[in-house]
């Protein structure tokens, strides 16, 4: 079978095994929108989409010494580009165009992801590992996830933002799930949420969140929040039974109204089957090339070499940079220049007293009996007036 055919969604399985004809399950509006679009009909208007995240900065320009602009300026600049919406993603999927997705966890990474033109940016609970040094994703709280979402939203004005619901924020009941999702949307400023798993309670949670007007991305295969039950970070769908369950789980999430499903660490044929069976996009991570799109963790693909995360750096991740080496070299050079007093030199000591005020300042110090301080100030005046010679600052001692 050709690659292009695998990217064209087709129904391969007997879905009555999951949703029999007599089932009372009705696909929510988001799923219907996707079906209408794929069959050439006119889809309803996109579901509720928060735009508050695009103006989460206080809007005040930062002082000129910091370069001005700040988050508001960045957001305004990025907003000039066409914003990615669910309609954008549906269109790409309908045309068979791959969907690009990557994680981000703070304002700088949000800016980078937005500038690179990604379709989707996931503010993942993997922040627990790559940003906070934990061995898994479980410790991060809902409040902390919201803060990460807010930071990314300030920097990413164009890309479609997805916020993870962290472990412990949606398992107890559908009411808890909806409440957590509403908080992530309203306070975090994202466009949608992602939840893991396909157990009946998770399907109910997904359906309830969609019914509340919030777009939901599903996540099956290796679900990191279930690491204790899975016995570690292990690939899923490697037996016939578990492979079929992956496809059935994807179908169940689609019927619950999810607009896309992440397939993590499953064999490529399993991902291909799920992709072909669905009418919504699949996003692969360690699932081969036959998904509708791909996602990787920001720190993994950039090679930042976070020590805590390096222990579990995934085999499927291609490293596109050695940012960790660049950072280490820059930090080492800075430390060396501080210790050798070659930084800051005159070119990085920009703030001066007006020439007419120098003598008055020195005399004022001497009048207060601060002669040593006056001598130090005079030395500094002479130093900052010097030019750098061959890259080495020349200190002229005040006489």
From Swiss-Prot:
Cofactor requirement: Mg(2+)
Predominant cellular place of this UniProt entry's protein: mitochondrion
Positions that bind Mg(2+): 125, 164, 196
Reactions catalysed: 3-methyl-2-oxobutanoate + (6R)-5,10-methylene-5,6,7,8-tetrahydrofolate + H2O = 2-dehydropantoate + (6S)-5,6,7,8-tetrahydrofolate
SUPFAM superfamilies: Phosphoenolpyruvate/pyruvate domain
Chain sites annotated for binding 3-methyl-2-oxobutanoate: 125-126, 164, 194
Pfam annotation, one family: Pantoate_transf
Cofactor binding, note field: Binds 1 Mg(2+) ion per subunit.
The organelle targeting sequence, given as a residue range: 1-90
Pathway assigned in UniProt: Cofactor biosynthesis; (R)-pantothenate biosynthesis; (R)-pantoate from 3-methyl-2-oxobutanoate: step 1/2
Statement: the UniProt record of this protein carries the keyword Transit peptide: yes
Keyword Iron among UniProt keywords: no
Enzyme Commission designation: 2.1.2.11
Gene Ontology CC terms: mitochondrion
GO process annotations (BP): pantothenate biosynthetic process
InterPro entries: Pantoate_hydroxy_MeTrfase, Pyrv/PenolPyrv_kinase-like_dom, Pyrv_kinase-like_dom_sf
Gene3D superfamilies tied to this protein: Phosphoenolpyruvate-binding domains
Signal peptide: none
Keywords: Magnesium, Metal-binding, Mitochondrion, Pantothenate biosynthesis, Transferase, Transit peptide
Locations listed in the record: Mitochondrion
Domain of life: Eukaryota
Family assignment from sequence similarity: Belongs to the PanB family.
Protein name per UniProt: 3-methyl-2-oxobutanoate hydroxymethyltransferase 2, mitochondrial
Organism: Oryza sativa subsp. japonica (Rice)
Name of the encoding gene: KPHMT2
């Amino acid at each position: 079978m050709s690659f292009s055919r695998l990217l064209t969604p087709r129904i391969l399985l007997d879905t009555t095994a999951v949703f029999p004809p007599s089932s009372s399950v009705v696909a929510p509006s988001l799923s219907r929108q996707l079906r209408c679009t794929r069959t050439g009909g006119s889809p309803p208007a996109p579901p509720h989409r928060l735009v508050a995240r695009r103006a989460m900065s206080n809007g005040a320009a930062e002082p000129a010494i910091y370069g001005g602009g700040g988050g508001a300026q960045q957001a305004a600049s990025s907003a000039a580009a066409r914003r990615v919406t669910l309609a954008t993603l549906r269109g790409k999927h309908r045309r068979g165009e791959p969907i690009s997705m990557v994680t981000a966890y703070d304002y700088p990474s949000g800016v980078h992801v937005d500038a690179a033109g990604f379709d989707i940016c996931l503010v993942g609970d993997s922040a627990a590992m790559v940003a906070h040094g934990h061995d898994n994703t479980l410790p991060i709280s809902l409040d902390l996830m919201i803060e990460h979402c807010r930071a990314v939203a300030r920097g990413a004005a164009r890309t479609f933002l997805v916020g993870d619901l962290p472990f412990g924020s949606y398992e107890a009941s559908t009411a808890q799930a909806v409440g957590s999702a509403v908080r992530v949307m309203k306070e975090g400023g994202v466009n949608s949420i992602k939840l893991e798993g396909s157990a009946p309670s998770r399907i109910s949670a997904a359906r309830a969140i969609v019914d509340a007007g919030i777009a939901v991305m599903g996540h099956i295969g290796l679900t990191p929040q279930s690491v204790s039950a899975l016995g570690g970070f292990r690939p899923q769908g490697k037996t016939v039974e578990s492979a079929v369950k992956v496809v059935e789980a994807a179908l169940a999430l689609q019927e619950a109204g999810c607009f896309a499903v992440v397939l993590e660490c499953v064999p490529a044929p399993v991902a291909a089957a799920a992709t072909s069976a669905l009418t919504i996009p699949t996003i692969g991570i360690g699932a081969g090339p036959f998904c509708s799109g791909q996602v990787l963790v920001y720190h993994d693909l950039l090679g930042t070499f976070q020590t805590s995360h390096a222990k579990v750096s995934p085999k499927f991740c291609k490293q596109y940079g050695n940012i960790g080496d660049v950072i280490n070299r820059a930090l080492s050079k800075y430390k060396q220049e501080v210790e050798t007093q070659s930084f800051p030199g005159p070119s990085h000591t920009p703030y001066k007293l007006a020439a007419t005020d120098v003598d008055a300042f020195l005399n004022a110090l001497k009048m207060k009996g601060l002669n040593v301080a006056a001598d130090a100030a005079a030395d500094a005046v002479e130093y900052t007036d010097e030019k750098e010679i061959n890259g080495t600052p020349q200190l002229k001692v005040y006489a």
